[in-house]
Regions:
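A short SAM/SAH-binding and catalytic strip from SAM-dependent methyltransferases
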Residues: 1-17
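Short catalytic/ligand-binding loop motif for oxyanion handling, primarily in non-cytosolic enzymes
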Residues: 10-12, 43-47, 130
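Short, glycine/charged-enriched secondary-structure capping and boundary segments
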Residues: 16-19, 50-52
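SAM-dependent methyltransferase
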Residues: 36-109
Length: 144
């Protein structure tokens, strides 16, 4: 089963909703069933947010704002896109939906209670080991 950061199963808005999602994942897997999850790393957010970034893509420029609600461990993300060849205007970055971010330690605890064992974690699709200094957290787990 795949659970990707683009919201295929859910956007991880708050703990209550997330536990429902994690429970559905655990129940959907047979013993020995495999789960791969790709989310943003809460440990990274603790030390790197708030911040503003820009990304020059093939068709345009994206300006992003990452705000961090430390007490709730919640990311508030907003962005504005500019297409090349169009006039620029002063950016007004609107807040997006809140997203509760988790550390590997938190995911390990939550999954353990649901009968999922973390086998490995990565920082990207090349297999780089996860760390608190990488924004991406990929977790590979098995249903016990």
């Amino acid at each position: 089963m795949l659970n990707m950061a683009d919201g295929a199963i859910g956007y991880l808005e708050d703990d209550e909703e997330n536990h429902k999602i994690f429970s559905v994942i655990a129940k959907a897997l047979k013993k020995g069933g495999k789960h791969f999850m790709d989310i943003m790393n809460g440990s990274y957010a603790q030390t790197h947010f708030p911040c503003k970034l820009w990304d020059a893509g093939e068709k345009g420029l994206t300006l992003s704002a990452f705000e961090w609600e430390k007490d709730r461990k919640t990311l508030i993300y907003g962005q504005v896109d500019y297409m090349y060849g169009e006039a620029f205007y002063k950016p007004e970055i609107k807040e997006g939906n809140p997203i509760r971010l988790y550390s590997l330690h938190e995911i390990t605890e939550i999954f353990g209670k649901l009968g999922l064992r973390i086998c490995n974690s990565f920082a990207d699709f090349s297999g780089k080991p996860s760390s608190d200094n990488d924004i991406q957290l990929m977790v590979y787990s098995i249903r016990e």
